[in-house]
Amino acid sequence: MTELRYAVRALFRNPGLTLAAILCLALGIGANTAIYSVVNAVVLRPLPFKDPERLARIYTEFPTYGSSGGFHKFWMSTPELLDLRRLTNSWTSLEAYTISGVNLSGGAEPVRVTAASITGGMLPMLGVAPQLGRLLGPDDDRYGAPLTLVLSDGLWRRAFGGAPGVIGRELKINGLAATVIGIMPRGFAFPPGETDPPELWYPQQINPNNPGGRSNHFQSVIGKLKPGITIQRAQAEFGQIMAEQGRNRTPHFHSFDPKFHTLLALPYHGEVVGSVKTAMLVMLGAVAFVLLIACVNVGNLLLARAESRHHEIAVRKAVGASMWHLARQCLIEGFVLALSGAALGLAVAWGALRLILAFNQGSIPRAEEIGIHWSVLAFTAGASFLTGIFFGLAPLAQFAGDSQESLKTATGRSTATRGAHSLRRLMVVSELALALILLVGAGLMVRTFWKLQQVNIGLDPARVITMRLALPQAQYTQLPAVKQLWTRLLERVNALPGVQSAAVLSGLPPLRPLNANDIQIEGYVKKPGGPDQNVDYDQAVSPGYFEMLHIPMVEGRAFDARDGASSNDVAIINLTMARAFYGNQSPIGRRIREDRDTPWCTIVGVAADVKNGGIDKPTGTEIYFPYSQVNGGIRALYIAVKTSGDPQRIVSAVRRRVAELDPSLPIAQVRLMEDVIAAANARPRFLTVLLALFSFVAVSLAAVGIYGVMAFLVAQRTREFGIRMAIGAEPADVLALVLAQGMRMGLTGVAFGAFGAFILTRFIRQLLFAVQSFDPLTFLSTAAILTLVIAAACYIPARRATRVDPMIALRYE
């Protein structure tokens, strides 16, 4: 205990240096722990299901079909799922789910929630257990069985106050009676990785005699491999199935085929986290650099402290202190320093993790599993301990010999050795190089985000608010009643004070699920290499939609009042579709239809492109229909309202108008159109902000490091500067001398950093948009920024050197 008290006193004889070392360690440990906790939960940790390594995501693909180079990782139709269950022997089970929004009533008030309809074996296959009640099983999934459902912990607590009595209670889902049979445990998320995760699960209850059309692809399929079966073996079996069906191929397009309609099985974990894996590993590399810079800074500080203690250690050794006693004291000081940094680092990690999760906005899958992971805290703390111990023992290196000789050496005014100076300079060069690598990475992401912001979405989102409304089929069985409600609602909303215009639409740009619907184009003959008759996106809208969002018509006209249910069917296509199927010819007056059972529609307009598959993706083909002429798919639509003032103020009035028509209908997903567009950029914005933050920390630490070294060197050369000025040197000469020394060190770090960035930035190439990994503007601007920081950090001690009084310096010596 006495040695511990002495260690604390010794450390705080120079409180500024000690606090700086603790802060450096805390920043490095805290940032590293926070990001590794995210990476560990999202990427490294297995999925929280039974035997997760045996789970696989199964897709169908159409490699040669469509107008955009084929459809990859596509959904499966229900008949295809039933076929696959019958034909394959590699899987213990093949289950499916579909995500949608549902109206849930029976609680305090109707709510719109995200739900997953699942096949009966899904939850048992995952090996999860409910916290209350039971799971959905095969009996619940039997066609015609009473409808049952399972609630998430969050929905149970939010809508029902966490009351156990909800088990057995009858609710209504989309107007159909359903009994609550179970509550899932807190933190359960299925499917994992969804931006808007389901809070309710109910059985699909597939009709075995009428499972739907083979071309109706909407099922997401997950399989569990039999023990001992690899995914490669299962894929090989898929190849046999495709080859057999391909040999017996019928004119029906949707038979499995090794060329036209393939099957693909991939590990489920990789499919859940694959979209963010690179970004997460980049973040882990970034914080590792921050930790390295922090440790280098601590090493520099402790080396400076070691040189200031030469005399103390030499005296103690001369009066009989053993090397073991001195080493033990230095070890204790190192442990105190590292423990303090680790403790503060834990607080930094906790705060950083809270900020990351708050700023997440759906950018990180499996966010519900993220928390402080103690193994990485132990690792980073251990690394810091080793750093502190190594440099804490550094003062003893020069005193391993004779005590009297050590004392003579230590009593000199200039105790720093050439080796110590070289090591210190090497450390500064290293941390500056690491800082520039981080700065370049952040600069590339800033450029990417800026480029994304400059992309023309194709519409004007100003003062537009959107909301989702769904009409349950159990209540609205007839399509004319559905269309009538939408028409009456639009009339009432358009009549509200402050509303400039209102419209309904089936899909919300700029990021929508792919439709990939077959179409028929009158007179179209496919040329070699030409597109198939298929459209990527379809959109049901009301008259006034194009005008409200300022979507220009390239040719023809927009929908208007003449395009009603009793009028001739019409359509509008986007410019991409016009070019794909009509080339340089005008499509106005040509006819098109979705399938053989629907009437022909006359194309009356060509609209400018609106982003539909993501801001960073090429615009897909798109066809618009008036909602009043559509025969299905319009029970759930978005309402878009453009106002003359703050759009948020109109929401309550719209709710009242909906309640006047049907009080059982909840409005959901109320968002400004500007926020919808911003959400499409959420992931690059998230990565940009974090990289910018880490690069700022890294540059700050590097600036502190070079400032500390230059200040120490100036202090060591006080006599030299005094003599120079005593014999006629001007202050400007001394200033230039010190700045030149610091800038040589700094520019060496910049050069090594630029080389390192050139090598490493290629690993973030897939995260960039419209920016090359070696972007000259980014490299030059970040190098210039770091050079200015270096110059500023060197100027302060250089300026101090010019103020040395020659007489005081000579008298000191």
Locate the predicted segments by residue:
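Membrane-helix entry/capping segments
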Residues: M1-L17, G101, E109-R112, G144, ...
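Small-residue-rich transmembrane alpha-helices
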Residues: V38, G299, F335-S406, L444-T448, ...
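Mid-to-C-terminal secondary-structure elements
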Residues: A115-P138, L147-L281, R354, G441, ...
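Short, strongly hydrophobic transmembrane alpha-helices
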Residues: N14-V42, P46, I293-C295, A342, ...
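Membrane-proximal extracellular/periplasmic loop immediately following the first transmembrane helix
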Residues: L47-G101, H217-I222, N456-D518
